[in-house]
Curated annotation (Swiss-Prot):
GO biological process, one term: protein modification process
Protein name stated in the entry: Polycomb protein Suz12
Covalent cross-link Glycyl lysine isopeptide (Lys-Gly) (interchain with G-Cter in SUMO), where: K74, K75, K77
Subcellular location: Nucleus; Chromosome
Residue numbers spanned by region Interaction with JARID2 and EPOP: 81-108
Species in which this protein is naturally found: Mus musculus (Mouse)
Gene name tied to this protein: Suz12
Polar residues bias spans: 707-717
Post-translational modification: Sumoylated, probably by PIAS2.
Family: Belongs to the VEFS (VRN2-EMF2-FIS2-SU(Z)12) family.
Amino acid sequence: MAPQKHGGGGGGGSGPSAGSGGGGFGGSAAAVAAAASGGKSGGGGCGGGGSYSASSSSAAAAAAAAGAAVLPVKKPKMEHVQADHELFLQAFEKPTQIYRFLRTRNLIAPIFLHRTLTYMSHRNSRTSIKRKTFKVDDMLSKVEKMKGEQESHSLSAHLQLTFTGFFHKNDKPSQNSENEQNSVTLEVLLVKVCHKKRKDVSCPIRQVPTGKKQVPLNPDLNQTKPGNFPSLAVSSNEFEPSNSHMVKSYSLLFRVTRPGRREFNGMINGETNENIDVSEELPARRKRNREDGEKTFVAQMTVFDKNRRLQLLDGEYEVAMQEMEECPISKKRATWETILDGKRLPPFETFSQGPTLQFTLRWTGETNDKSTAPVAKPLATRNSESLHQENKPGSVKPAQTIAVKETLTTELQTRKEKDNSNESRQKLRIFYQFLYNNNTRQQTEARDDLHCPWCTLNCRKLYSLLKHLKLCHSRFIFNYVYHPKGARIDVSINECYDGSYAGNPQDIHRQPGFAFSRNGPVKRTPITHILVCRPKRTKASMSEFLESEDGEVEQQRTYSSGHNRLYFHSDTCLPLRPQEMEVDSEDEKDPEWLREKTITQIEEFSDVNEGEKEVMKLWNLHVMKHGFIADNQMNHACMLFVENYGQKIIKKNLCRNFMLHLVSMHDFNLISIMSIDKAVTKLREMQQKLEKGESATPSNEEIAEEQNGTANGFSETNSKEKALETDGVSGVPKQSKKQKL
């Protein structure tokens, strides 16, 4: 659609008397005015000097209506561009935020290792030579040895501090240079924050002085030799882990004291006895003396945090110092602020305005030994030489208080010169072109690196970069376009991306505190893959990243398979956990631990006799085993119970207790009288078979056992049985039935 220009609409009247003017908005307005006054005007062109015609007023009204309809549609072009640009930014903003978050999470707990991928095989620098002598039993000893070396490595070394100087750039130079102070007093304290006890309101703090040094003030680093700098060593005994149960963290407190500029008579420069006014107020004099006299600056750095992690590695540090003023504020609630002319400075401006202390930190095995602590690596740079800088020492500075000082060794400088002189290896220039609605919206600056823009992964090869973008960032569509100096990658939004959940389905049904947690390897659902054919791997080619001719986007259909399949229990509808897959939970409804738990709970009852407890045990185990859950199943449950446990009931003389159990179930309308009759008849038949199978006359021991069982409380049911003489429906005397047993 071609852009429309304002005022480009214009005249064309009707017939040969049409005006020749070009008016656009002016013509429409004139037509409306003419129609309102007399109705003798043409439809257009009169705004630019057109002639009148004999058309009717209806034509003028139609032209006016058409002009009024066109006016609201036309908008300035800038508004369209800005609105379209906002939509473009919103479309790319959400996927970018998602991939940035995933990048940070994968750095902490990676799901997979990039070096194990086929298209990233060049990142795997390990060899398989040691696999011949590998033993599983040696893994534990290696890990323990490695941990022991790390702890002893970080604690058996001396902390050596070499102070370069104290820089105070805002300080005004003294007029009397002979009395100018060239050094300041530096006191280093080791602050130990101990664990808080119950009676303590806050964590107790211990300050251990480690020494004082005279540090040069504003030295010229070009004229000072490195060996002349003062140094201080902190013994490793101060960081012993034996007190780890008491000390929570260790930190260094730097306290710089700068004396005032005074003459030999003890007076401040420019101040004599004649200048002292006796009538001057004492507070004002003290304030002036404090401003021109001694000043104290402090700064604190953490050595070991509460997790025993070393925070200060080898390197050069520059610490921003804060002036400590006399104030009645409690030290527990005091906070430090850098003030300049009543305004708070940003963090990095304090290094150009406020006082700073520069020093070099090293961990050494002995006082004069070489460094043994791990060297701080420089920040990752986005250029092709980042690989050469991985093993070079650098400096790491904590945020807000320590500035980064970039140091390059002579070896690195010579290597850079060599690389610049040798242009045999051509660098690939990669730039990205972002498309929205099939139009180019933004194009990045050409870079000579192969880092992923979203997760900053160094792919090292163009094919690996494109493969990584396609597989790991599938919310976008990447098309490779050849460029003489490198490559152009067109990036567009994947409108067909399936954003449904494709992770572990167990996490959806877990408790909120345990869902999506990855503290270590977990058991997954066992699966079996059947490999019918494994074709030969295709050779890597850049043609697979070219834009398809038919315009169709290659989409991968997502489906739940393998470890992501989820099964449910049929009785409880709860998800089946992976560790339960090996046990057939549908058949085993009464595990051993549940049976023992049921028996133990029944044994704890105190308001029932032993006979009732035995019947309750047998009945509960019977119901658990067969899974009876409905009322209409109770009739069948009673008959099955008699078949399975009838002989045990007869041998233990539990017939009367079982009859009481049946009557109680009838009271709750769980079973019918017919079921009671069938159960009692079945039990009587089993009793007769047992009597025939055994001796006709029972022994004296069996008679005594039966009498004892009746005396132990089995006869307690007689009072209840007499109350149930007859049934309300059938009128059958229940007492006579029980007496037959």
